[in-house]
Amino acid sequence: PAQIKDVFGRRCRIIGRRFELAHVYSGRELIEVATFRAPPKKAVTSATGMILRDNNWGSIEQDFARRDFSINAMYYQPRKGIVLDFCNAVDDIQNRRLRLLGDPLLRFEEDPVRMLRTLRFAAKLNFQIDDDILKIFTPEITNLLRDVSPHRLYDESQKLFTMGHLNRVLPMVIDFGIWKQLFTDIQPKITPFIELVAKNTDQRIQMGKTINPAFFYAVLLWQQFL
């Protein structure tokens, strides 16, 4: 990222602490530049295995091994017009399979937010979650989410609930034990009211209309304050 900033000067801003990114501005357009990563150093992981700093730069081969899902580990070379696939990601896409690279338990420990990403991708793409993930994705392992900062957890939750498939993902949030980590004081139950609002939210997103996430949270709390 520092080298990118040296090239673009004031038009570049480095963001992120856990993983630095370079934001390059060209007029009104924003281009996000991510540098290839190498395996993290032991010293920057928490007691539960969560990666606290991931700014160890490396090669494309090292970077591919650091990706979370196979479908996120493909690289496009625009000048040559080719896609580099090191992990049979194309097969996973054709078979509509969501697969983590490496040991799923270790990948969740490295970054518990990957649990939310698992549900988001599965619901949005209508992919089947790989059996190796299902074996370890228990309500107990969701306790790892308690180590995630509230700000990051909120951001990832927003992506989960505003992707246009809220009706599909809500039952998954309950079944996989995520609900109790996000809404500790709300009963894990999809009422007809919540289902109606979720359906309406999805429809508005699909129609290109704006939504207010606060409205959905208000519906979740409706029974609490009646």
Task: Enumerate the language-model features and the residues they cover.
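Catalytic cores of the polymerase beta-like nucleotidyltransferase superfamily
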Residues: 1-226
